[in-house]
Amino acid sequence: MRQAARTARYDPALGLEAYGLRAVDRPFPSHFHDHYVIGVVERGTRTLTCGRRRQVIGPGDVLLFNPGDSHACIQADGSLDYRGLNIPRSTMLALAEEVTGSRAMPGFSAAVVRDGELAGRLRALHWAVLGDKPELRREE
């Protein structure tokens, strides 16, 4: 049996926290965050409930939660390995303005996205933040 673990590191230059969960077997009861959460499931299958929608998530799935999105998940098969980014509203607002030119809070329309390229980019950013890589590499 694998040992459960959690790692986390805040990156002040990017204004976000990267964290990883390994070998998680416990359910996550319904909860929400005051910040944006973007994550990638690396291992295990879970049943995710977000709002009124229930779906099975597994390796490679990208999870997108807006601040205040109520969500819960329970184990379906195997323990969970997950990597995520916690992004404060202020950081997301600044990023949205930089990309769109508009100072408006963005919102995710779906809680789960199946996009291998996006998952790969998120993994690279996650590794760069946890590994304390040079700022230029993280900003890519």
Regions picked out by a protein language model, each given a short descriptive name:
Residues 98-140:
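Amphipathic alpha-helical segments enriched in hydrophobic/aromatic residues interleaved with Lys/Arg
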